[in-house]
């Protein structure tokens, strides 16, 4: 189901200009996203939770003495952005905890992440632009982080005034069409989740581009709302509510795929009482496990009753329990003779014949009992299933634009989305140069994505200005903390960080030598003169960061709509720029493994787009491990302090 959020009011143009000129910063930066549209749980949604009494759920940070003091010290350390006196920055330890204790209840799940960056030189995309190779849709990922530089021309109107947002919807439409074009199913792969022996499905980007006619789209949208809201019909899993089966026995069936609501590591610990059991949460499309009777008249009544049950998203307030369901249906069915007859019929039917075949026949009858044409139901199901990727955040600052897309089934596991734009351009704070950073929590791992456009220039010493931009971005980037709104969080405080964009680092080599080595594809000799690689080796900037091996030609500077580097034709009146690897992708943190680092041959701009694919190990809370650890601790405590006997 979709949850519509209130529409943000349009910002007044003069206020935008004044805020830019006066360098006024809001407390919280807004961003755009798709409407919330959750998907039913599957075997990919780990971990499951069972009702367990006597559980006191705490984080390992709480187990250390002096936790508050250590966090206060940590806040003081990062209050200046982690910048040392010498001008560099020092990476701080975000957690002070025992990894041994942490391993007792945390699992690791591999998530495939694609990071893509492209300086489009202010060019608007054509309607038929193909970016499949750039986004590597043949090797689909779980998360796509797509960054642009110069998405609008860097003229005075966009820099000093309200930037043009016209190209953004067009780029988003192309990205959405590309990611949701294919509908292939890849093979099952092994995923280190809660159950290492379980096979988890790895979906590729879905098929058939969304080119349906407007009338079909409207019909499908209306059908989705009616089926989900009025009949509690789950289009994704073909499961239906059956209230009659629930009448004889209302005890909940154990579903191992029920997910544990994620809790960010910086949030307050949740205390679960020892007497009451853990309450389960249903996703917006999850079914209640009931069955409708064979009689359509009885089915309509039970469907109307089931509609009264309130649903909840897994990461929101736990407001639905089986006791509430049981009490509600008991009250409604106690005075209903139809309910008793339907339950008796269902009980008699279930006693003979093949139960599995009977369920399939009942399912077909249920579909027809709603009076809906099967072709419309199928069309509605296809439209819903085709949207496998949704946009969870996008943000523009002048020419810098970053957009994050994620599989719809993973959206429920994303929390604490924050954005932080930092301008380091004209006057030291204008947005023609700078960065847009995104912070989010996926399961229990904090991730940060930094899309930047650094100072240009190929003269000697220009790399020092770029280094200064990096230090300034790290110092000024702030994310409001979930634990304490007054305590900022910085880029190095995350578990995994990805920095990408037009970093503008050049080659310390003459133009003629560069072009000669490029023509001979001698990349290793060129890399020895690369400014960024030298800085990484010396530790002057991006200390501790990593970059994959570069095995592709320099990405800058090309002639527009051509495969020829600019400056090769000496008779043309153009700036002479030696080829360079200006567009880069770096990463910092544990559990990151790079699979691919490449560029794509799209000739629209004077830059070539760059892509990197990663396998990222994110932390997932495992309730089973926590239960075992608590049992061991309780047993040890009982052995040391035995209960007195009377």
UniProtKB/Swiss-Prot annotation:
Signal peptide: none annotated. This is Type I inositol polyphosphate 5-phosphatase 2. Residues 59-99, 185-207, 329-369 are annotated as: Disordered. Disruption phenotype: No visible phenotype. Alterations in germination and in early seedling growth. Enhanced sensibility to abscisic acid (ABA) with elevated levels of Ins(1,4,5)P3. Expressed ubiquitously. It catalyses: 1D-myo-inositol 1,4,5-trisphosphate + H2O = 1D-myo-inositol 1,4-bisphosphate + phosphate; 1D-myo-inositol 1,3,4,5-tetrakisphosphate + H2O = 1D-myo-inositol 1,3,4-trisphosphate + phosphate. Belongs to the inositol polyphosphate 5-phosphatase family. Pfam families: Exo_endo_phos2 (PF22669). The lineage of its organism: Eukaryota, Viridiplantae, Streptophyta, Embryophyta, Tracheophyta. Residues 188-207 have a biased composition (Polar residues). Its EC number is 3.1.3.56. Keywords: Abscisic acid signaling pathway, Hydrolase. Has phosphatase activity toward Ins(1,4,5)P3 and Ins(1,3,4,5)P4. Seems to be involved in the abscisic acid (ABA) signaling pathway. Could also be able to hydrolyze PtdIns(4,5)P2 and PtdIns(3,4,5)P3. Residues 575-590 are annotated as: Catalytic 2. The keyword Cytoplasm does not apply. Residues 495-510 are annotated as: Catalytic 1. One of its GO terms (biological process) is abscisic acid-activated signaling pathway. It is an enzyme of class 3 (hydrolase). Residues 59-74, 341-350 have a biased composition (Basic and acidic residues). InterPro entries: Endo/exonu/phosph_ase_sf, IP5P_plant, IPPc. The keyword Iron-sulfur does not apply.
């Amino acid at each position: 189901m979709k949850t519509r959020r209130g529409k943000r009011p349009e910002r007044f143009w003069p206020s935008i200009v004044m805020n830019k000129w006066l360098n006024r910063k809001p407390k919280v930066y807004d961003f755009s996203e798709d409407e919330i549209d959750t998907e039913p749980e599957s075997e990919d949604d780990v971990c499951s939770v069972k009702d367990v009494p006597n559980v006191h759920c705490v984080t390992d940070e709480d187990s250390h003495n002096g936790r508050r003091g250590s966090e206060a010290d940590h806040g003081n350390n990062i209050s200046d952005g982690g910048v040392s006196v010498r001008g560099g920055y020092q990476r701080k330890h975000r957690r002070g905890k025992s990894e041994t204790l942490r391993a007792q209840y945390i699992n690791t799940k591999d998530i495939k992440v694609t990071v893509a960056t492209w300086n489009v030189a202010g060019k608007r995309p054509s309607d038929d632009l193909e970016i499949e190779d750039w986004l590597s849709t043949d090797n689909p990922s779980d998360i796509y982080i797509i960054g642009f530089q110069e998405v609008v021309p860097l003229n005075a109107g966009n820099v000093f005034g309200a930037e043009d947002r016209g190209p953004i919807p067009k780029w988003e439409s192309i990205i959405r069409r590309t990611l949701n074009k294919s509908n292939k199913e890849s093979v099952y792969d092994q995923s280190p989740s809660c159950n290492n022996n379980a096979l988890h499905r790895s979906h590729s980007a879905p098929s058939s581009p969304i080119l349906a006619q407007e009338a079909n789209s409207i019909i499908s949208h209306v059908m989705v709302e009616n089926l989900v809201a009025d009949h509690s019909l789950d289009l994704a899993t073909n499961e239906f509510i059956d209230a009659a089966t629930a009448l004889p026995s209302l005890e909940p069936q154990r579903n191992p795929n029920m997910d544990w609501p994620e809790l960010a590591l910086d949030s307050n610990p949740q205390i679960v009482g020892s007497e009451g059991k853990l309450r389960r949460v249903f996703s917006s499309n999850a079914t209640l496990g009931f069955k409708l009777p064979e009689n359509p008249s009885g089915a309509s009544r039970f469907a109307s009753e089931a509609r009264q049950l309130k649903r909840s998203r897994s990461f929101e307030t736990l407001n639905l329990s089986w006791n509430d369901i049981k009490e509600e249906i008991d009250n409604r069915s106690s005075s209903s003779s139809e309910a008793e007859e339907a339950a008796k019929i269902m009980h008699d039917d279930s006693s003979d014949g093949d139960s599995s075949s009977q369920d399939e026949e009942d399912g077909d009858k249920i579909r027809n009992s709603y009076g809906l044409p099967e072709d419309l139901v199928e069309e509605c199901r296809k439209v819903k299933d085709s949207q496998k990727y949704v946009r969870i955040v996008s943000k523009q600052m002048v020419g810098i634009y970053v957009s994050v897309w994620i599989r719809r089934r993973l959206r429920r596991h994303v929390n604490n989305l924050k954005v932080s734009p930092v301008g380091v351009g004209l006057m030291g704070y204008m947005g023609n140069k700078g960065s847009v950073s995104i912070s989010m929590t996926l399961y229990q791992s904090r991730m940060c994505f930094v899309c930047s456009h650094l100072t240009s220039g190929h003269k000697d010493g220009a790399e020092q200005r770029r280094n200064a931009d990096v230090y300034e971005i790290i110092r000024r980037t702030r994310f409001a903390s979930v634990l304490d709104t007054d305590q900022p969080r910085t880029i190095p405080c995350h578990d995994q960080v990805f920095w990408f964009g037009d970093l503008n680092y050049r080659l310390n080599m003459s133009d003629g030598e560069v072009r000669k080595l490029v023509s001979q594809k001698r990349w290793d000799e060129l890399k020895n003169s690369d400014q960024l690689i030298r800085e990484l080796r010396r530790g002057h900037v991006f200390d501790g960061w990593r970059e994959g091996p570069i095995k592709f030609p320099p990405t800058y500077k090309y002639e527009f709509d051509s495969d020829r580097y600019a400056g090769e034709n000496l008779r043309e009146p153009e700036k002479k720029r030696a080829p360079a690897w200006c567009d880069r992708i770096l990463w910092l943190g544990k559990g990151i493994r790079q699979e691919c680092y490449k560029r794509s041959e799209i000739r629209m701009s004077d830059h070539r787009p760059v892509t990197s694919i990663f396998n990222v190990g994110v932390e997932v809370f495992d309730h089973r491990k926590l239960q075992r650890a608590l049992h061991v601790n309780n047993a040890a405590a009982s052995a040391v302090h035995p209960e007195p006997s009377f």
